[in-house]
């Protein structure tokens, strides 16, 4: 409904409006340096996704779905229904601070209430199912209080943009139903399931139209087929999902119940992050119009600078403020005048004094207690999905290495103790090389430049 209204306000057909904005997000993935072989950009209208959503619907048992009259309080910005007690005074959405709408119509409902016991058992046997633990406790409490069935369709006459419900062209799938399915549709689930043919579902006028079907589908950023789903969902032990704290119930309860109903294994882990907030601590949101265009930041500061800020300066689990001023301060302090200055000073000492990098010495880093400690801490950060912790560990090495330059002053020592100074510079080159390798997942371009500089030092 949000897309339909936004397109109408822009004076465009919904399909044209959505395609134009989708391309902007597709470009963002490229600009942020996401590995094309590891991501698949997917949209509601993609055949791969439509087949997956319709197939999942068709796999539910008759007792999992029923059709009934419904009246609810709906926020267009959140694309979600709210209980009265969850709203602010005046029936305002707690996120957008705008009035919710009363929706009255006949919808299909998913029997969410039937999965309370199974969900609680899932949380009990999987203590790391939701990270951080405070969010696991939150969803456990929510489910423990009892569940209400939720609407999974809208009338196509009122919401003419969505995936047609199998065998009922008068309804399209509710956005939160089909959106959750992308976790399996994007990795080729519909191709991995026999009979995933949705040709019997005819789209009503204005609804998403199916493209031609195939068994191997991609958008130019990674082709997926039946083996892709088996690899990522089954052979790796499950999929890790990331979402904002306002999606906790959808991801950790509703989606898991849908998987159970279809006979699929649950997700492996769900990481819940906080909001990125703007002025006044308000959540950044397209609907609120208080976002900052990351492409503009990339254009001025480069991809790695943006990746650095997101990983190290934003909390992985709590709300984090973002302003241009904070970004500039972090860039100058930790990248330009921090890492950048350190690399420049070490390479100048190495090239100016003919000291080259000795790769065989990298294996001796165990004698540097701070590097081993930071390396272990970095690994723990990645294992616990705490990227900020991993980045802080790397910057501890950077700070220690900078302190060594200040304390030993090899650029001065070289005049009175050439051998000692050269040994210091060799150690600094090793440290710089290790810093480069550890930065690869966070700042790949910068890391590769550092590694190249060190390896080619003479």
PLM regions with names:
Residues 32-38, 63-66, 261-266, 348-358, ...:
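Surface-exposed helix-capping loop/turn segments at secondary-structure junctions
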Residues 40, 269-272, 451-452:
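Beta-strand segments within the central parallel beta-sheet cores of soluble alpha/beta enzyme folds
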Residues 48-59, 95-96, 102-194, 222-352, ...:
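Structured secondary-structure scaffolds
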Residues 90-91, 125-126, 168, 193, ...:
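Short, glycine- and charge-enriched coil/turn segments that flank and shape catalytic ligand pockets
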Residues 192-224, 362-364, 369:
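Intrinsic disorder/low-complexity segments
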Residues 313, 318, 326-363, 367-458:
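Helix-rich, typically C-terminal accessory recognition domains appended to large enzymatic cores
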């Amino acid at each position: 409904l949000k897309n339909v209204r936004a397109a109408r306000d822009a004076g465009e057909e919904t399909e044209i409006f959505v395609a134009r904005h989708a391309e902007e997000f597709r470009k963002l993935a490229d600009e942020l340096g996401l590995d094309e072989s590891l991501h698949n950009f997917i949209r509601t209208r993609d055949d791969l996704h439509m087949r997956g959503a319709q197939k999942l619907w068709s796999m539910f048992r008759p007792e999992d779905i029923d059709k009934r009259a419904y009246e609810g309080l709906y926020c267009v910005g959140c694309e979600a229904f709210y209980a009265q007690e969850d709203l602010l005074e005046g029936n305002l959405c707690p996120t957008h601070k705008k009035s919710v709408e009363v929706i009255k119509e006949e919808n299909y409902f998913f029997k969410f209430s039937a999965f309370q016991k199974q969900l609680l058992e899932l949380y009990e046997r999987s203590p790391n199912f939701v990270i951080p633990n405070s969010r696991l406790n939150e969803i456990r409490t929510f489910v423990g209080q009892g569940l209400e069935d939720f609407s999974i369709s809208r009338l196509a006459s009122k919401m003419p943009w969505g995936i047609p419900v199998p065998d009922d062209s008068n309804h399209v799938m509710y956005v939160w139903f089909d959106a959750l399915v992308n976790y399996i549709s994007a990795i080729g689930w519909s191709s991995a399931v026999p009979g995933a043919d949705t040709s019997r579902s005819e789209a009503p006028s204005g609804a998403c139209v199916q493209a031609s079907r195939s068994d191997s589908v991609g958008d130019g950023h990674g082709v997926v087929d039946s083996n892709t789903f088996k690899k990522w969902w089954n052979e790796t032990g499950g999929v890790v999902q990331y979402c904002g704290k306002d999606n906790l119930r959808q991801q950790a309860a509703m989606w898991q119940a849908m998987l159970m109903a279809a006979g699929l294994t649950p997700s492996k882990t769900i990481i819940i992050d906080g909001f990125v907030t703007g002025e006044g601590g308000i959540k950044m949101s397209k609907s609120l119009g208080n976002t900052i265009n990351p492409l503009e930041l990339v254009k001025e500061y480069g991809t790695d600078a943006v990746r650095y800020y997101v990983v190290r300066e934003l909390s992985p689990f709590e709300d984090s403020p973002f302003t241009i001023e904070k970004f500039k301060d972090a860039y100058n302090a930790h990248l330009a005048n921090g890492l950048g200055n350190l690399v420049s000073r070490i390479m100048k000492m190495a090239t100016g004094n003919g000291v080259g990098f000795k790769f065989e010495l990298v294996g001796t880093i165990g004698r540097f207690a701070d590097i081993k400690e930071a390396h272990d801490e970095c690994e723990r950060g990645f294992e616990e999905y705490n990227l900020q912790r991993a980045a802080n560990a790397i910057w501890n090495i950077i700070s220690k290495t900078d302190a060594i330059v200040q304390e030993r002053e090899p650029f001065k020592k070289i005049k009175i103790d050439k051998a000692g100074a050269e040994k210091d510079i060799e150690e600094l080159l090793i440290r710089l090389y290790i810093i480069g390798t550890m930065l690869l997942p966070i700042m790949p371009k910068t890391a590769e430049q550092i590694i190249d500089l060190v390896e080619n030092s003479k």
